[in-house]
């Protein structure tokens, strides 16, 4: 089973992703509300996949992505973005993010991105 770390500063967004993924039989390994928590939890939990919000307090998603990829260059991270963040998404993909999903989350788009990244 694929274990996922869900990262977003908005609890309702984490809940939405959790519901979509659990319904599709993914296991939520953990949740983080900022990039610093995300990097720490990644190191502890070693999930198969991370969904990472870009705009967060303490440490944003780009910085957390860098930290995670420094720790584990093979990490699979999907960035979660608002519509008008194309430049930042491009930066994240160039850094090593595997895919992105746009808010508000649509179940099919989330599951398609996860399937692409996980090779299902």
UniProtKB/Swiss-Prot annotation:
The gene is ccdB. CDD domains: REC_CheY. InterPro entries: CheY-like_superfamily, Sig_transdc_resp-reg_receiver, ST_Response_Regulator. It comes from the Bacteria. Keywords: Phosphoprotein, Two-component regulatory system. GO terms for biological process: phosphorelay signal transduction system. This is Protein CcdB. Coiled coil: none annotated. It comes from Bacillus subtilis (strain 168).
